[in-house]
């Protein structure tokens, strides 16, 4: 469909702008994790010139992940006047939830493996709740960070978690690492 990635980038930015106009929303909320997909998504949303709220939501994240997301957000705020950010550390909320489930006296029994999966999915769902709190409060939409393989290939996302978004700017394309470098020429990651 496109001969070079700059056309894909421009197409996505135009599509994001059109989506906002057609749906009477004012901007975007993006969860920035420190990964490539959230860096790409937040940069593309920033390129629309519409307000973008970048949110860090650590739940016992590694220092490296937090540093990467912080550095990317700082770069966005320096290069795009439409970007603001907030850090909502959800570790204590998650810990309280885990504690309540571990202390529940019940006749129900859970396998450790399934319980750990449920706790992992809970992290994603807590983040989704937080993203939508901010989006609804500002008349913004949640821009998902899932890529094509995650969203349409292997279906690697948590239902009602990181799969619970309004729009997925990078899920319909084959954007890859070289494309990230091209976006970097526009504004960087």
Ranges and model annotations:
Residues 36, 181-183:
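Intrinsic disorder/low-complexity signal
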Residues 39-43, 163, 173:
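Ubiquitous "structural anchor" signal
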Residues 1-158:
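ATP-dependent adenylation/nucleotidyltransferase module used to activate substrates
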Residues 173-179:
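Conserved small/polar residues in nucleotide/adenosyl-binding loops
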Residues 184-189:
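Hydrophobic alpha-helical segments, chiefly the membrane-spanning helices
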Residues 117-121, 167-172:
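Short, surface-exposed loop/turn motifs that are enriched in glycine and acidic residues
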Residues 155-170:
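A mobile, often basic/glycine-rich helix-loop segment
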Residues 28, 180-181:
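Exposed boundary/loop context
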């Amino acid at each position: 469909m496109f001969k070079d990635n700059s056309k894909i980038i421009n197409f996505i930015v135009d599509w994001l702008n059109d989506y906002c106009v057609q749906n009477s929303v004012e901007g975007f909320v993006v969860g920035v994790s420190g990964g490539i997909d959230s860096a790409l998504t937040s940069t593309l949303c920033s390129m629309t010139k519409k307000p973008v709220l970048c949110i860090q939501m650590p739940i016992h994240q590694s220092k490296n992940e937090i540093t990467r997301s912080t550095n990317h957000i700082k770069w966005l705020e320096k290069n795009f006047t439409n970007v603001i950010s907030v850090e909502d550390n959800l570790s204590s909320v998650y810990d309280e939830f885990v504690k309540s489930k571990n202390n529940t006296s019940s006749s129900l029994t859970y396998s450790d493996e399934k319980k750990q999966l449920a706790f992992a999915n809970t992290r994603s769902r807590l983040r989704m709740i937080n993203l939508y709190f901010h989006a609804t409060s500002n008349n913004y939409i949640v821009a998902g960070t899932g890529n094509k393989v995650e969203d349409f290939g292997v279906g690697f996302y948590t239902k009602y978690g990181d799969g619970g978004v309004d729009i997925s700017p990078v899920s319909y394309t084959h954007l890859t690492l070289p494309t990230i470098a091209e976006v970097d020429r526009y504004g960087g990651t």
